[in-house]
Amino acid sequence: ECEGMMLQADGTPFDWFNTGEKYSLHGFVDDATGKITGLYMCKNECLLGYLEVLRQTLENYGIPISLYPDKYSVFFPPKKVNDHITIEEQLNGREKGITQFGRIVEELGIEMFPASSPQAKGRIERLWETLQSRLVTEFRINNIQSIEKANEFLIDYIKKYNAQFAIPATNSKSVFLKLPKRYDLDELLCVRFERTIDNAGVFSINNSKFQIIDKSLPPKTKIQIYLSQKIGMRVKANNKIYDVEPLELISKDNIDTNSLDYHQWLADVVIELINEFYLKDAKASYKSLA
Protein backbone atom coordinates (compact mmCIF):
# COMPACT_ATOMS: atom_id res chain seq x y z
CA GLU A 1 0.00 0.00 0.00
CA CYS A 2 1.25 3.48 -0.91
CA GLU A 3 1.37 6.69 1.07
CA GLY A 4 -1.56 8.86 0.03
CA MET A 5 -3.74 5.97 -1.13
CA MET A 6 -6.20 6.39 1.75
CA LEU A 7 -6.51 8.81 4.64
CA GLN A 8 -8.66 7.99 7.65
CA ALA A 9 -10.62 11.01 8.91
CA ASP A 10 -12.21 11.57 12.30
CA GLY A 11 -12.82 13.98 15.15
CA THR A 12 -12.74 13.35 18.88
CA PRO A 13 -14.10 15.41 21.80
CA PHE A 14 -11.84 15.38 24.86
CA ASP A 15 -10.82 17.44 27.89
CA TRP A 16 -7.52 18.44 26.31
CA PHE A 17 -6.70 21.23 28.78
CA ASN A 18 -7.76 19.31 31.90
CA THR A 19 -10.35 21.97 32.74
CA GLY A 20 -13.48 19.83 32.65
CA GLU A 21 -14.49 21.23 29.25
CA LYS A 22 -14.28 19.15 26.09
CA TYR A 23 -13.05 20.41 22.71
CA SER A 24 -12.98 18.50 19.44
CA LEU A 25 -9.74 17.62 17.68
CA HIS A 26 -10.10 16.89 13.96
CA GLY A 27 -7.52 14.84 12.11
CA PHE A 28 -6.46 12.87 9.05
CA VAL A 29 -3.99 9.98 9.26
CA ASP A 30 -2.39 8.15 6.35
CA ASP A 31 -3.46 4.50 6.39
CA ALA A 32 -0.21 3.17 4.92
CA THR A 33 2.28 4.99 7.16
CA GLY A 34 0.40 6.26 10.19
CA LYS A 35 1.52 9.81 9.38
CA ILE A 36 -0.70 12.59 10.64
CA THR A 37 -1.41 14.86 7.67
CA GLY A 38 -3.38 17.44 9.64
CA LEU A 39 -4.80 18.28 13.07
CA TYR A 40 -7.10 21.14 14.04
CA MET A 41 -9.05 21.86 17.22
CA CYS A 42 -12.48 23.54 17.43
CA LYS A 43 -15.08 23.91 20.13
CA ASN A 44 -17.21 21.22 18.45
CA GLU A 45 -16.73 18.70 15.67
CA CYS A 46 -17.63 20.72 12.60
CA LEU A 47 -17.06 21.50 8.95
CA LEU A 48 -14.56 24.27 9.72
CA GLY A 49 -12.31 21.86 11.59
CA TYR A 50 -12.25 19.36 8.75
CA LEU A 51 -11.63 22.09 6.18
CA GLU A 52 -8.55 23.25 8.08
CA VAL A 53 -7.25 19.66 8.29
CA LEU A 54 -7.84 19.30 4.56
CA ARG A 55 -5.96 22.57 3.98
CA GLN A 56 -2.94 21.30 5.95
CA THR A 57 -3.00 18.03 4.01
CA LEU A 58 -3.18 19.72 0.61
CA GLU A 59 -0.45 22.24 1.42
CA ASN A 60 1.99 19.79 3.03
CA TYR A 61 1.36 16.55 1.13
CA GLY A 62 -0.98 17.03 -1.82
CA ILE A 63 -4.24 15.43 -2.91
CA PRO A 64 -4.88 11.91 -1.55
CA ILE A 65 -6.58 9.25 -3.63
CA SER A 66 -9.32 8.55 -1.09
CA LEU A 67 -10.73 9.63 2.25
CA TYR A 68 -12.29 7.27 4.79
CA PRO A 69 -14.48 9.07 7.37
CA ASP A 70 -17.51 7.94 9.35
CA LYS A 71 -21.10 8.68 8.29
CA TYR A 72 -21.19 12.06 10.05
CA SER A 73 -23.38 14.58 8.19
CA VAL A 74 -20.40 16.84 7.45
CA PHE A 75 -19.30 14.15 4.99
CA PHE A 76 -22.53 12.52 3.82
CA PRO A 77 -25.99 14.11 3.64
CA PRO A 78 -28.96 12.80 5.61
CA LYS A 79 -31.75 11.13 3.66
CA LYS A 80 -33.98 14.22 3.52
CA VAL A 81 -31.26 16.05 1.58
CA ASN A 82 -30.70 13.08 -0.73
CA ASP A 83 -34.39 13.34 -1.60
CA HIS A 84 -34.03 16.94 -2.84
CA ILE A 85 -31.92 16.91 -5.99
CA THR A 86 -32.36 19.84 -8.36
CA ILE A 87 -33.16 19.37 -12.03
CA GLU A 88 -29.78 20.88 -12.91
CA GLU A 89 -28.01 18.34 -10.68
CA GLN A 90 -29.97 15.49 -12.26
CA LEU A 91 -29.00 16.67 -15.74
CA ASN A 92 -25.37 16.70 -14.63
CA GLY A 93 -25.65 13.06 -13.61
CA ARG A 94 -26.01 13.46 -9.84
CA GLU A 95 -28.21 10.86 -8.19
CA LYS A 96 -27.72 11.82 -4.54
CA GLY A 97 -27.37 14.98 -2.49
CA ILE A 98 -23.95 16.24 -1.50
CA THR A 99 -22.57 18.13 1.49
CA GLN A 100 -20.34 21.19 1.36
CA PHE A 101 -17.35 19.01 2.27
CA GLY A 102 -18.41 16.38 -0.26
CA ARG A 103 -18.53 19.02 -2.98
CA ILE A 104 -14.97 20.12 -2.18
CA VAL A 105 -13.43 16.64 -2.24
CA GLU A 106 -15.36 15.87 -5.43
CA GLU A 107 -13.83 18.95 -7.07
CA LEU A 108 -10.40 17.70 -6.01
CA GLY A 109 -11.09 14.23 -7.41
CA ILE A 110 -10.87 12.54 -4.00
CA GLU A 111 -12.95 9.40 -3.56
CA MET A 112 -14.80 9.36 -0.24
CA PHE A 113 -16.54 6.37 1.30
CA PRO A 114 -17.90 5.84 4.84
CA ALA A 115 -16.55 3.52 7.51
CA SER A 116 -19.07 1.04 8.82
CA SER A 117 -17.79 1.18 12.42
CA PRO A 118 -15.07 2.74 14.62
CA GLN A 119 -13.17 -0.55 14.36
CA ALA A 120 -12.96 -0.05 10.59
CA LYS A 121 -10.93 3.11 11.26
CA GLY A 122 -8.54 1.44 13.65
CA ARG A 123 -5.50 3.53 12.84
CA ILE A 124 -7.07 6.88 13.67
CA GLU A 125 -8.85 5.45 16.72
CA ARG A 126 -5.45 4.35 18.04
CA LEU A 127 -4.09 7.80 17.23
CA TRP A 128 -6.73 9.38 19.45
CA GLU A 129 -5.80 7.06 22.31
CA THR A 130 -2.17 8.12 21.95
CA LEU A 131 -2.91 11.84 21.68
CA GLN A 132 -5.35 11.86 24.58
CA SER A 133 -2.45 10.76 26.74
CA ARG A 134 0.45 12.67 25.21
CA LEU A 135 -1.16 15.95 24.18
CA VAL A 136 -2.69 16.63 27.58
CA THR A 137 0.80 16.41 29.07
CA GLU A 138 2.32 18.53 26.28
CA PHE A 139 -0.32 21.22 26.72
CA ARG A 140 0.26 21.33 30.47
CA ILE A 141 4.05 21.54 30.15
CA ASN A 142 3.76 24.32 27.56
CA ASN A 143 1.03 26.18 29.48
CA ILE A 144 -1.45 25.89 26.60
CA GLN A 145 -5.05 26.47 27.68
CA SER A 146 -6.83 27.78 24.59
CA ILE A 147 -7.87 26.46 21.19
CA GLU A 148 -5.86 29.17 19.42
CA LYS A 149 -2.62 28.29 21.24
CA ALA A 150 -3.28 24.58 20.78
CA ASN A 151 -3.62 24.94 17.00
CA GLU A 152 -0.36 26.91 16.84
CA PHE A 153 1.38 24.20 18.86
CA LEU A 154 -0.01 21.36 16.75
CA ILE A 155 1.76 22.55 13.59
CA ASP A 156 5.19 21.57 14.95
CA TYR A 157 3.84 18.71 17.05
CA ILE A 158 2.67 16.88 13.93
CA LYS A 159 6.23 16.89 12.57
CA LYS A 160 7.65 15.53 15.83
CA TYR A 161 4.95 12.86 16.07
CA ASN A 162 5.50 11.67 12.50
CA ALA A 163 9.26 11.53 12.96
CA GLN A 164 8.80 9.29 16.00
CA PHE A 165 5.83 7.10 15.10
CA ALA A 166 5.32 6.96 11.31
CA ILE A 167 6.35 3.74 9.57
CA PRO A 168 7.46 3.09 5.97
CA ALA A 169 4.70 2.16 3.54
CA THR A 170 4.73 -1.30 1.97
CA ASN A 171 5.25 0.43 -1.36
CA SER A 172 7.71 3.31 -1.09
CA LYS A 173 6.03 5.31 -3.86
CA SER A 174 3.81 8.17 -2.69
CA VAL A 175 0.58 8.60 -4.64
CA PHE A 176 -0.29 12.02 -3.24
CA LEU A 177 -0.99 14.26 -6.24
CA LYS A 178 0.49 17.72 -6.46
CA LEU A 179 -2.14 20.42 -6.01
CA PRO A 180 -2.62 22.17 -9.38
CA LYS A 181 -1.86 25.89 -9.39
CA ARG A 182 -5.36 26.67 -10.63
CA TYR A 183 -6.79 26.05 -7.16
CA ASP A 184 -7.28 28.99 -4.82
CA LEU A 185 -7.47 27.20 -1.46
CA ASP A 186 -9.00 30.22 0.25
CA GLU A 187 -11.91 29.99 -2.18
CA LEU A 188 -12.04 26.21 -2.47
CA LEU A 189 -12.13 25.47 1.27
CA CYS A 190 -15.28 27.45 1.96
CA VAL A 191 -18.93 27.04 2.76
CA ARG A 192 -20.40 27.99 -0.61
CA PHE A 193 -23.84 29.22 -1.59
CA GLU A 194 -25.43 30.55 -4.75
CA ARG A 195 -28.01 33.31 -4.49
CA THR A 196 -29.89 35.78 -6.69
CA ILE A 197 -29.92 39.42 -5.57
CA ASP A 198 -33.09 41.50 -5.51
CA ASN A 199 -33.63 45.01 -6.88
CA ALA A 200 -31.64 46.52 -4.00
CA GLY A 201 -28.73 44.09 -4.22
CA VAL A 202 -29.93 42.18 -1.16
CA PHE A 203 -29.53 38.44 -0.55
CA SER A 204 -30.02 36.17 2.44
CA ILE A 205 -28.34 33.18 4.07
CA ASN A 206 -30.53 31.25 6.51
CA ASN A 207 -32.67 34.40 6.95
CA SER A 208 -29.71 36.70 7.68
CA LYS A 209 -29.80 39.51 5.10
CA PHE A 210 -26.85 41.20 3.40
CA GLN A 211 -26.53 43.89 0.75
CA ILE A 212 -23.90 44.34 -1.93
CA ILE A 213 -22.46 47.83 -1.50
CA ASP A 214 -21.73 48.32 -5.21
CA LYS A 215 -25.06 49.21 -6.84
CA SER A 216 -23.92 48.49 -10.40
CA LEU A 217 -25.11 44.87 -10.44
CA PRO A 218 -28.50 44.51 -12.11
CA PRO A 219 -31.41 42.86 -10.26
CA LYS A 220 -31.66 39.07 -10.47
CA THR A 221 -27.90 38.70 -10.88
CA LYS A 222 -26.68 35.32 -9.64
CA ILE A 223 -23.88 35.57 -7.10
CA GLN A 224 -21.54 33.06 -5.47
CA ILE A 225 -20.98 33.42 -1.72
CA TYR A 226 -17.91 32.00 0.01
CA LEU A 227 -17.65 31.76 3.81
CA SER A 228 -14.62 30.65 5.81
CA GLN A 229 -12.50 31.55 8.81
CA LYS A 230 -9.70 32.48 6.44
CA ILE A 231 -11.52 35.03 4.27
CA GLY A 232 -14.75 35.82 6.12
CA MET A 233 -17.42 36.38 3.46
CA ARG A 234 -16.48 36.79 -0.20
CA VAL A 235 -19.14 37.52 -2.80
CA LYS A 236 -18.43 37.06 -6.51
CA ALA A 237 -20.37 37.77 -9.66
CA ASN A 238 -18.95 37.54 -13.16
CA ASN A 239 -15.49 36.80 -11.68
CA LYS A 240 -15.47 40.08 -9.73
CA ILE A 241 -15.42 40.34 -5.93
CA TYR A 242 -17.97 42.63 -4.23
CA ASP A 243 -18.05 44.05 -0.70
CA VAL A 244 -21.17 43.45 1.37
CA GLU A 245 -22.72 44.83 4.53
CA PRO A 246 -25.14 43.13 6.95
CA LEU A 247 -28.72 44.38 7.08
CA GLU A 248 -30.39 41.92 9.42
CA LEU A 249 -28.66 39.17 11.36
CA ILE A 250 -30.83 36.37 12.68
CA SER A 251 -30.23 34.21 15.74
CA LYS A 252 -29.86 30.45 15.59
CA ASP A 253 -33.32 30.03 17.10
CA ASN A 254 -34.90 31.83 14.15
CA ILE A 255 -33.20 29.87 11.38
CA ASP A 256 -35.57 28.20 8.94
CA THR A 257 -34.95 24.52 9.62
CA ASN A 258 -37.05 23.56 6.60
CA SER A 259 -34.63 25.28 4.22
CA LEU A 260 -32.74 22.94 1.91
CA ASP A 261 -29.56 24.77 2.96
CA TYR A 262 -30.17 23.80 6.56
CA HIS A 263 -28.20 21.24 8.51
CA GLN A 264 -27.59 21.75 12.23
CA TRP A 265 -23.84 21.76 11.71
CA LEU A 266 -24.10 24.09 8.73
CA ALA A 267 -26.31 26.52 10.62
CA ASP A 268 -23.78 26.58 13.45
CA VAL A 269 -20.90 27.17 11.03
CA VAL A 270 -22.67 30.05 9.28
CA ILE A 271 -23.59 31.66 12.59
CA GLU A 272 -20.06 31.30 13.91
CA LEU A 273 -18.58 32.95 10.82
CA ILE A 274 -21.13 35.76 10.69
CA ASN A 275 -20.61 36.36 14.39
CA GLU A 276 -16.83 36.50 13.97
CA PHE A 277 -16.74 38.82 10.98
CA TYR A 278 -19.86 40.96 11.36
CA LEU A 279 -20.90 41.16 15.00
CA LYS A 280 -17.68 41.95 16.88
CA ASP A 281 -18.37 45.66 16.47
CA ALA A 282 -21.98 45.37 15.43
CA LYS A 283 -24.56 48.02 16.22
CA ALA A 284 -26.79 47.38 19.20
CA SER A 285 -29.79 47.15 16.89
CA TYR A 286 -28.46 43.92 15.39
CA LYS A 287 -29.88 40.76 16.87
CA SER A 288 -27.32 38.87 18.91
CA LEU A 289 -26.42 35.46 17.55
CA ALA A 290 -26.85 32.64 20.05
Labelled PLM ranges:
Residues E1-A9, F14-D15, D83-K96, S174-K181, ...:
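Basic, flexible linker segments flanking DNA-binding modules
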Residues E1-I36, K43-I65, G102-E107, G201:
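Mobile-element integrase/transposase regions
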Residues Q8, L67-P69, F113-P114:
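A structural signal for short, well-ordered beta-strand segments and their strand-loop junctions
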Residues G38-N44, I87-L91:
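The substrate-binding groove and active-site-proximal loops of carbohydrate-active enzymes
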Residues E52-Y72, I231-V235, L260-V270:
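Short, solvent-exposed cationic patches
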Residues L58-G93:
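Acidic/histidine-rich, metal-coordinating catalytic segments
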Residues I158-L289:
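C-terminal, beta-rich DNA-binding module of retroviral/retroelements integrases
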